């Protein structure tokens, strides 16, 4: 067989049906046989978007996909999405065609050190050293991505294609996930059995490992509140009486108040990243004297950010099952009714407040939000918009959220009954995630309604994909764009620490993304009231069934929520002083 046939046959062995990228000569020998192999090549407008589409596809389906691009400048466009997928624990196949071996090191056309480029962004990488090893290496890279729940890279010199090799296809070797050590399981079960106020923190590992039912059994046995990890609102059913919402930035105040009372925390399937447990609503809620049981598939992340009493390296589902089996018969009985009452009261109070919360507060000594309300009295606030959106969303919807102020304000609102319903940029935090990732989700789940969210700044980064999704073979989506004509997160920083000296924070109010959508052959809608917003959301989700993609511009006032990095910002101090008069004229360098 040829090397490209060997490559594609391994893809078929693993059921990889979708590839995302921009066509390039360095991999045309394999893309040429994609149609015959049952592999769909989604030709995107930009490689960065292609990688984020792949992230959305895999996270919404649990199935691997592949990203590929031309060597050199095409491959460099994949840096942001691959690092995003790494911190989202998304297993992706990264295929990097390389400049030809015979010219490497000569500074040839489109040459770059592609292995070095991704070495800190993938769980495994390998270069094909000989054409006869094409299938072997690809099979191993795919297996490593699955085991590591992260992207893995195969680097292929382009002169290794179109060669005939006499090989057999390698076998697939799937390893069973580990369930942790017996001693650690016993310790965890004993701590939870004797706890007065146990709390479960449900993370990404619960979604990835399919452990929601096991988390429910534990929670119900213990009558413990269940907090969802930051950006993992789909890691526990929102309608469950013990679900108290997400921790982290703009999350659930109820979750923060309840976890602060914990004497034992079961952090299930989470690396406890530091940003997701920062103080919120003025509450420094992480329970510093509690016993912490951390469960993570990756042993290197246990105890990395928090003091841990018991660390368990293992699959969230298997670990939760074993802990449940080891609980004492009276586990959870201590103060059970008192705890149940407190959960109900705290949760009810927060939901009541959230349902009537219309506006953002100003820090003492600042007036930006007050002035924003007065300046645009007829416009919705971000919170009013989010409530209107919630009222229009179908129950089984998949949503993706970009990074940014208006999207972040929405963290406390969406709840889900099933996993793989909530896509977010994760801790790498790239702007421009919301639009491409929801395209990937719809490709993977064509019969499910989907809605993407982005601010007008973040949307501008990925808006070129409008030219892709307008084509007839692309599925229909709904994309919501919050229009407040500013880079909100950075503007919030400016109002708090830089005396409203706005540099680079303003966006063009004359630009209409709805009109851009119309020009692309898509449907553009502009809404200005809560009623219009709810109606547009409902209509657009119905229109998806008819193959109609809708971009909804939601016109907002310029209120700004809590800053992302209050922990990292401070008022600057001027020492030497800066004056325009000190700027020297620069002569052209060739003079």
Predicted segments with their positions:
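A short, charged, Gly/Pro-tolerant segment at domain boundaries
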Residues: 157-162, 342-353, 557-560
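Flexible, glycine/charged-enriched surface loops at secondary-structure junctions
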Residues: 151-153, 331-350, 357-361, 551
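Active-site nucleophile and cofactor-binding loops and adjacent substrate-binding regions
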Residues: 22-24, 42-52, 67-74, 129-130, ...
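N-terminal alpha/beta PP-like core and its mobile active-site loop of ThDP/TPP-dependent enzymes
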Residues: 1-330, 334, 392-395, 474-479, ...
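Short beta-strand segments
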Residues: 155, 400-402, 553
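Thiamine diphosphate
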Residues: 95, 103-105, 109-110, 305, ...
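Active-site diphosphate/adenylate-binding microenvironment
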Residues: 4-7, 22-25, 30-35, 348-445
């Amino acid at each position: 067989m040829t090397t490209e046939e060997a490559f594609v046959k391994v893809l078929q062995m693993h059921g990889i049906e979708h590839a995302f990228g921009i066509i390039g000569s360095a991999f045309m020998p394999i893309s040429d046989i994609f149609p015959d192999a049952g592999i769909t090549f989604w030709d995107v407008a930009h490689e960065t978007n292609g990688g984020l589409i792949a992230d959305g596809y895999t996270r919404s389906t649990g199935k691997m996909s592949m990203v590929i691009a031309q060597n050199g400048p095409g491959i460099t466009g994949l840096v942001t999405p691959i690092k995003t997928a790494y911190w989202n624990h998304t297993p992706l196949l990264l295929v990097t065609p390389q400049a030809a071996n015979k010219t490497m090191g000569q500074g040839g056309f489109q040459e770059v050190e592609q292995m070095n480029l991704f070495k800190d962004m993938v769980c495994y990488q390998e270069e094909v050293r000989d054409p006869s090893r094409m299938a072997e290496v690809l099979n191993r890279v795919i297996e490593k991505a699955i085991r590591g729940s992260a992207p893995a890279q195969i680097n292929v010199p382009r002169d290794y294609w179109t060669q005939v090799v006499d090989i057999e296809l390698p076998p697939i070797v799937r390893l069973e996930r580990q369930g942790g050590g017996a001693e650690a399981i016993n310790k965890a079960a004993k701590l939870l059995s004797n706890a007065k106020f146990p709390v479960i923190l449900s993370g990404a590992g619960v979604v990835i490992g399919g452990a929601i039912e096991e988390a429910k059994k534990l929670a119900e046995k213990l009558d413990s509140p269940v907090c969802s990890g930051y950006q993992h609102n789909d890691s526990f059913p929102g309608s469950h009486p013990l679900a108290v919402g997400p921790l982290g930035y703009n999350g659930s105040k109820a979750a923060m108040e309840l976890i602060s009372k914990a004497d034992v925390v079961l952090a299930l399937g989470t690396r406890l990243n530091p940003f997701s447990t920062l103080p919120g609503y003025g509450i420094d809620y992480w329970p510093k004297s509690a016993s912490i049981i951390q469960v993570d598939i990756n042993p290197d992340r246990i105890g990395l950010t928090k003091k841990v009493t018991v660390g368990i390296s293992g699959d969230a589902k298997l670990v939760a099952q074993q802990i449940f089996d080891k609980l004492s018969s009276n586990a959870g009985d201590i103060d059970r009714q008192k705890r149940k009452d407190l959960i109900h009261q705290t949760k009810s109070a927060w939901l009541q407040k959230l349902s009537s919360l219309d506006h953002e507060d100003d820090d003492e000594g600042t007036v930006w939000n007050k002035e924003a309300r007065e300046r645009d009295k007829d416009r919705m606030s971000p919170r009013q918009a989010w409530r209107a959106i919630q009222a229009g969303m179908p129950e089984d919807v998949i949503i993706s959220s970009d990074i940014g102020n208006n999207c972040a304000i929405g963290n406390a609102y969406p709840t889900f009954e099933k996993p793989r319903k909530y896509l977010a940029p994760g801790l790498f935090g790239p702007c421009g995630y919301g639009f491409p990732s929801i395209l990937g989700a719809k490709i993977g789940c064509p019969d499910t309604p989907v809605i993407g969210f982005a601010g007008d700044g973040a949307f501008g980064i990925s808006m070129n994909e409008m030219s892709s999704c307008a084509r007839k073979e692309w599925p229909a989506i709904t994309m919501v764009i919050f229009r407040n004509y500013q880079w909100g997160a950075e503007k919030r920083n400016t109002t708090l620490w830089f005396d409203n000296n706005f540099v680079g924070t303003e966006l063009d109010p004359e630009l209409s993304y709805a009109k851009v959508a119309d020009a692309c052959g898509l449907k553009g809608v502009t809404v200005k009231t809560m009623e219009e917003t709810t109606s547009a959301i409902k209509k657009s989700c119905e229109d998806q069934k008819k193959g109609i993609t809708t971009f909804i511009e939601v016109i907002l006032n310029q209120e700004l929520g809590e800053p992302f990095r209050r922990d990292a910002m401070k008022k600057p101090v001027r020492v030497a002083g800066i004056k325009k008069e000190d700027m020297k004229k620069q002569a052209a360098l060739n003079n």
